[in-house]
Amino acid sequence: MKKFKPIIRCVIFLAGLAAIMGVIDFACVQTGYVNYILRNVCAKDNGTDYDTVVIGASHARASSDPEQIDKNAGTYSINMAIPGETVKDSYYVLEETCRTNDIKTVILDIDYQYYFNPPKEGFYTEQFIQCQMDWRSYVKWQYIYDNMERMEIRNVFTRRQACTFTPSNMKDNIEQKLSKGYKEADIYSLDVDGGTYAGRGYFYIKPVSGELAG
């Protein structure tokens, strides 16, 4: 029995640490579009099976309307472009989309900015998409392994960039994660400045008026 005591203590310590991290994650880590769209594309209880996917960053999210694509191409598409998404992110977002959908066509948004000044790998915010993937997804674990080769291990598993510890923000986080909109990954429930979500990942930017309109 003495031989197993150190092991038992380690297990208890790790379990306690996981519980503490779970509470912090629930109360302090903000969530939003990335979490919702990843859950939407993987949901199978709504009878959807996309055959076309748009991959890119913010420009693609606001310029590629799945409804218009389907109308002209006879497809059933989803826009998985995510603001801040890198080329490496696109690879894993595509793999995650293919995990639960029979994708036949990929529309890849090519913007010179993606390649002209690509971000250096290893920065602590790099895993902002990886951290929002489902723990049951093998793609998430592939992504974790990839990031561990370049990042400090604590940054791989924690969402430092999304943490907030002010009482008001923690209250908002908890209310959001207990809401029906969050549980159902309802993108339309998100309040976003500058535009509205118009369906299947497409973000409609409101027309600019006044001096900024040019």
Mark where each language-model region is.
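N-terminal hydrophobic targeting signals that begin at the initiator methionine
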Residues: 1-2
